[in-house]
Amino acid sequence: MSKFFIDRPIFAWVIALVIMLAGGLSILSLPVNQYPAIAPPAIAVQVSYPGASAETVQDTVVQVIEQQMNGIDNLRYISSESNSDGSMTITVTFEQGTDPDIAQVQVQNKLQLATPLLPQEVQRQGIRVTKAVKNFLMVVGVVSTDGSMTKEDLSNYIVSNIQDPLSRTKGVGDFQVFGSQYSMRIWLDPAKLNSYQLTPGDVSSAIQAQNVQISSGQLGGLPAVKGQQLNATIIGKTRLQTAEQFENILLKVNPDGSQVRLKDVADVGLGGQDYSINAQFNGSPASGIAIKLATGANALDTAKAIRQTIANLEPFMPQGMKVVYPYDTTPVVSASIHEVVKTLGEAILLVFLVMYLFLQNFRATLIPTIAVPVVLLGTFGVLAAFGFSINTLTMFGMVLAIGLLVDDAIVVVENVERVMAEEGLSPREAARKSMGQIQGALVGIAMVLSAVFLPMAFFGGSTGVIYRQFSITIVSAMALSVIVALILTPALCATMLKPIEKGDHGEHKGGFFGWFNRMFLSTTHGYERGVASILKHRAPYLLIYVVIVAGMIWMFTRIPTAFLPDEDQGVLFAQVQTPPGSSAERTQVVVDSMREYLLEKESSSVSSVFTVTGFNFAGRGQSSGMAFIMLKPWEERPGGENSVFELAKRAQMHFFSFKDAMVFAFAPPSVLELGNATGFDLFLQDQAGVGHEVLLQARNKFLMLAAQNPALQRVRPNGMSDEPQYKLEIDDEKASALGVSLADINSTVSIAWGSSYVNDFIDRGRVKRVYLQGRPDARMNPDDLSKWYVRNDKGEMVPFNAFATGKWEYGSPKLERYNGVPAMEILGEPAPGLSSGDAMAAVEEIVKQLPKGVGYSWTGLSYEERLSGSQAPALYALSLLVVFLCLAALYESWSIPFSVMLVVPLGVIGALLATSMRGLSNDVFFQVGLLTTIGLSAKNAILIVEFAKELHEQGKGIVEAAIEACRMRLRPIVMTSLAFILGVVPLAISTGAGSGSQHAIGTGVIGGMVTATVLAIFWVPLFYVAVSTLFKDEASKQQASVEKGQ
């Protein structure tokens, strides 16, 4: 095939240009992401049950829905949380690869079976089913720069004017508003109600009767009488729109004709629909909307669309209102992709310099360099065909592929020049002869490297998604590289290279290149003598090899494990939890102190702080608080001390001084869709029905043991501690004797102490809600219970304390379930210097000490880590097996592949040493780097074994053939290995966004390639001679036995 294109170079150029054109067009359509869709798809079901406790929500809503979710296809796990504000979320997580649209339809179908079984109030509130990931993509905030708007005004504007356009934006899955829109708030005065002998239920009924929209029909509507000339719509009573209209609602007409209106018993006015959340931006009143990404959506495109939507709305915003972005996870996407592209450019430059050093000819160096854009652009075309995106994983694959793809072209060019120098042939004739020599080696290398990476594409789960990105990228690049090496490179050699005089190996050149050539020639002679010595004394070196293999196995058992390396995402979280039963005012004091520290003491790194009270990732309530901390761009905070991890450590040390609150500062995980924090994530589960109290005791024991374990830090419950609750007990017999109905009692309690949604009203053209509730000063203490009255069947007003009492007890404001059983979520991090795998092992030891009946399950990132850890050995074994079979097919021998395969531990030991010395972990990126090392180690061995086998077949002895092959292939092996190592160096020394992943993959590959090159060039001939001799002796014995039998 190569001869055809050597004679038709333009044909070869046309093929290359078509490949480049296809790839270039593909780049324009490929989406850009930090990572592919690693997180499994999840469907969230959200329900509200106003006034209900967490326990009530769990018993009457959560369990009813969970029981109907059985039988859903591809279900991985199901989790739920119920809060004391009546809210509830069930998250149904599916196996990786499940179509999220199909998953949502299945969940909705199952939900239809559960809906009739839910309380009427829940059905009335509605049930939301969304395709959204767990974490927030970004927060859009609004502040009043001139102080003319309150937080209620800002919240109302977001809900009324921003929420709907954003929810319609492509890629938005769900949202949460930190605040609420206006509602018509009716604050009841119990004393005035009693004086007029009215109850909250009377008020609710009057509002429902008089705040209505009536469909009144038409005048002259069809069918009409003959001759009718008029047709007009009748406008009947409409919904009320102003506070004054509500104030005039008639409640009662006394016998003397006097009237009691709503304003006589209540304060009426616009107020917030919900008062549980208070947001601030850098200390100023604010509101915000947190946006979650739809499952499978592109984060970068969605964020751009959101910003464009906001930009379209800004001209219509009130004067003094300013939009801010206090939390955004997408800058790291652009920055990390930019860093990898920069690394790609640096790698290409370094590879070019290495090639020029060895080839010492600009034309010869240019030929492999031309292969780089052809292969890289062609690889983008393949990525588009497979539906992939441009992300850090595919770009890492490109960086690794640069060293691999120039290898093939270098081998071709170097061999053509060697043939010209040794035999004095013209470039065209040398190219023809050279391709006849190395064509088999090129195909063999491509097969082996493809065999290393191809099995990765068939693994499942989130780890399989990561493996697949590398696999398809590198295998595509390798395939295109061989095509270019067989088609374009020989054609270029034939047309671009200048003839070389016979016997000219460059040692007579002057200057630096001449010195380098003489030094390398001298090194080659020394190398030949070294190989001859090793082949003469094989036993000691085989023993050394056994020691290396033993050391490799020992290091594999000692190196810490992880799923993915932690990354500086440019954002930080701080979570506040004040003592159970704390008021919002008390929590706000702690949040203010936290914000002041961050803005004053960490101003060099912190850009803004958006705080929220009433909410955090652990739950909702007045004792909860949260801070979204946006850091300055990476280039404005250089140095390790300004990284998000060091900032979190300093902040945590300061927050430990807070005596009246628990405050945790933590960075988000490397894959945001898999959780909200770095470290480990698990659920303690009540597997035997031991009850809430035993489970709570088990959790507390776990936290105590974890605090004493040196392998763990920042271990905390991702929930809320039991808090004081006032249990109202109704004496049914007394109530019946007094003529009071239980329905009236329940209605009064719900309205007065809770918040009752009555119906809707129209505010500036938008439908909003009407809420009925007792005045704040009539529901602050248990004694206020006596202020409220219920009317009995005789029309008399009976105080609550006549039939009701109360007592204090403890209860949970948040209840969790995992896979259908009560559970409590726990988060934590490994101690400095340890990996998440070490921390998870420590956790598993602690769980063994918990009470019987309490189990555990990993979730989120930890679930994926356990899954990836179990897959890694199978991945290595399968890759090695496929490599062996490819080599056996290539050499038509079962023995020769062993001499190639035995070199693998020499590369692996270097990767393990480099990774351990740098304090890194055995994570997914390390595993990919290790497979790359395995492939390149085998490639170097193939270059020697291929030539040794040919020389042996030409009649030379095994030892002589091995030494001659080593001499001939030393220069290309060193050149290609050095080119690859230097091409990966930018990954290992990178800084800024995405540097954690780059270090993880670059460090192992460099270490592995150094040892694979330095050691393998001596051990490969030893393996070839030892294996060939062994199998030859065995074959001779078998032949002799056969002949003897005859």
UniProtKB/Swiss-Prot annotation:
The chain crosses the membrane at residues 10-28, 340-359, 366-385, 392-413, 442-460, 474-496, 539-557, 872-891, 898-917, 924-945, 973-991, 1005-1027. The keyword Protein biosynthesis does not apply. It is a multi-pass membrane protein. Export of antibiotics and solvents is dramatically decreased in the presence of the protonophore carbonyl cyanide m-chlorophenylhydrazone (CCCP), therefore may be driven by a proton gradient. Antibiotic efflux is inhibited by pyridopyrimidine derivatives, such as ABI-PP, acting by binding to a hydrophobic pocket in MexB. Pfam families: ACR_tran. Component of the MexAB-OprM multidrug efflux complex, composed of six MexA subunits forming a hexameric tube, binding to a MexB trimer, which interact with the trimeric OprM outer membrane channel protein. OprM is thought to not directly contact MexB; instead, MexA joins MexB and OprM by forming a funnel-like hexamer anchored to the inner membrane. MexA may initially form a hexameric ring complex with MexB prior to OprM, then OprM undergoes a conformational change as it contacts MexA, allowing the periplasmic gate to open. Belongs to the resistance-nodulation-cell division (RND) (TC 2.A.6) family. This is Multidrug resistance protein MexB. It comes from Pseudomonas aeruginosa (strain ATCC 15692 / DSM 22644 / CIP 104116 / JCM 14847 / LMG 12228 / 1C / PRS 101 / PAO1). The gene is mexB.
